[in-house]
């Protein structure tokens, strides 16, 4: 009998075991779609980014004009740029929903998968940050100046570190060229880490909404979830196209249409919307080093989440108190995002400080207490 090529060919076998014959829980919901959507985001960003890099010039005197040239004179350059800029926003929407899903359903108990996922988030944030500097507009320049300057808060080595990162005594040409190099490299690092993420995931198999072992009831990934994923792809690509074609500048900062000028500071320096929650936490502490530590902690806290799990149930599906706390945390993050976009004045300062305190309080203190309380209430 002829061998089935799909199951025996060294390369096809890997694809088959990951995307076709992969045993998958029969009850996973639409929330499990976001992993593959992130894969599509990454592919889209790499393709559009490669096309943009072919026309971009990483030089302070030419960068802004090369982007303008791309939008005016390159065939569909405006579309490629808009897809790339808004694709980043969709990437972050998907990754935040993906992390939220993992948090809600206890997927973080697959510790290796979760930790690689957090490293992926950090790499994505670094990629987005260096990418935002490349058009060399006002917000690009001042964003780069403000954020890189934070490293100077590190005791003893801070100033040396910043000047080493800048390649000089301020954000200038060397900074732009190295940021372009990093922005080109990091997406491929993300692709590599994604494979590691999937390798660890396929060691344990997917979690499911009930948070219970599902080995007794698995179904093949294809055709059941491949068709379900295609629906997700279509919805996401339609929303990306809609955003890029109808309101491409909705999420951008108008300040970035002005070429970078080191002599004129914009009235309100703020990052893109997907960093605003962390920016609000940074600003809520009136001390530079303290703010930097809080900023780092706001994301690195994700590494602690598997250690803070006190409940005897994996998922929050049957834990109403934890559910309430989870949605309070989501609301808190939305408040932080809003505060981060506002000027530093009353009442935003105090709102930001309360929201920042609540963020750490909920994750570090309230979730473990409520988890233990629910065990007691349910006599577990």
Swiss-Prot record:
Sequence positions that bind heme b b566: 98, 197
Reported cofactor(s): heme b
Primary location recorded for the protein, binned into one broad class: mitochondrion
Compartments it resides in: Mitochondrion inner membrane
Cofactor: record remark: Binds 2 heme b groups non-covalently.
Function as written in the Swiss-Prot or TrEMBL entry: Component of the ubiquinol-cytochrome c reductase complex (complex III or cytochrome b-c1 complex) that is part of the mitochondrial respiratory chain. The b-c1 complex mediates electron transfer from ubiquinol to cytochrome c. Contributes to the generation of a proton gradient across the mitochondrial membrane that is then used for ATP synthesis.
Miscellaneous comment in the UniProt entry for this protein: Heme 1 (or BL or b562) is low-potential and absorbs at about 562 nm, and heme 2 (or BH or b566) is high-potential and absorbs at about 566 nm.
Name the record gives this protein: Cytochrome b
Natural source organism: Paradisaea rubra
